[in-house]
Structures are given as C-alpha cells and as structure tokens.
Amino acid sequence: MIVIINASNEQHDLKFSLANLDAIVKEVIQKEQQTCDEVNIYFVDTATICKLHLDYFNDDTPTDCISFPMDKDENSPYKILGEIFVCPQTAIEYALSHELDPYEETTLYLVHGLLHLMGYDDLEENDFLIMKEAEIRHMTHLKKLELYIK
C-alpha cells in the first residue's frame, strides 16, 4: 500500500521521532480495510490546538486532536484522507495525571484522529463505544508490533 504521509512536528513539548509514523498510519488504514493516497498529520502546541478548536468548534479549550476529513470527489482517482492535528502536550498532561505513557497516549490520539477521518464518530454514546472498541483494537495491534510514536 502506497500512502503519502505528510507529517510536521510543530511543537517542542514531547520529543519524538517521526520514524514510526508511516508504519502506524498504514497499519490502521489497512486494518480498517480503507484505501487512500495521502494523509496530512501535524503535531502542534497547545496554543495552536486551542486556536483551531475555537475557530472550528467555538471552544477555546485544549483538546487531544482535531481531524478534518477531505471532501470525497467521486470522479478523482486520488483520495486524500484528510488532516489531523495532534497536541502532544494534552497527552503529556493526561498521561501524568493517569500514570500512563505520554508516547502511547500521543499514539492513541493519532489513531483517534485517523478513525475520525475514516468515518467513526464519538458524539452519541453508541458511536462512542464503537470508536473506543476500534481504538483498543488498534492500540493492542500496534503494541504487539511495538509501533508507537517515540
């Protein structure tokens, strides 16, 4: 599977390499039996995620990730899945308060964003449970492969 993954690390809160990013993204897409040609991923600081949250959701509080699916052009053979903005600082804070690994938490936020791009939703309770199950399934699989953002 050839997928162009455009990634940008625009934050300095959590030091990590983007080396595993391609493999993580491809594993999730493949396990979901989806296809795409391109996905854009940005790791951003708290100020940036708050601005995006305010601009698009009228909420100026920090959040874990924000996903923007691309409109599907049925006539185009090239499929851009969308854009994901992940905030590692949110992962650090959550991980510290729950005795978790911030790298695993950041990976979870990436998986969460990918699932949103592939049509999962978490606003209604039933959808939330379905999405949570998918997150657990993917994180378990990635853990077996030792694939985390680190």
From Swiss-Prot:
What residues bind Zn(2+), as annotated?
H112, H116, D122
Q: Which GO terms describe its molecular function?
A: metalloendopeptidase activity; RNA endonuclease activity; zinc ion binding
Places the protein is found: Cytoplasm
Identify the GO cellular component terms for this protein.
cytoplasm
**Co-factor note (free text):** Binds 1 zinc ion.
Q: Which domain of life is it from?
A: Bacteria
Q: Which GO terms describe its biological process?
A: rRNA processing
Question: What cofactor does this protein call for?
Answer: Zn(2+)
The keyword Zinc is assigned to this record = yes
Alphabetical UniProt keywords: Cytoplasm, Endonuclease, Hydrolase, Metal-binding, Nuclease, Ribosome biogenesis, rRNA processing, Zinc
Enzyme Commission no: 3.1.-.-
- One Pfam family cited in the UniProt record for this chain: YbeY
User: Hey, which family's this protein in?
Assistant: Belongs to the endoribonuclease YbeY family.
Q: Write down the PANTHER family for this protein, in alphabetical order.
A: ENDORIBONUCLEASE YBEY, CHLOROPLASTIC
Role, per record: Single strand-specific metallo-endoribonuclease involved in late-stage 70S ribosome quality control and in maturation of the 3' terminus of the 16S rRNA.
Please state what the protein is called. Endoribonuclease YbeY
Which organism is this protein's natural source? Protochlamydia amoebophila (strain UWE25)
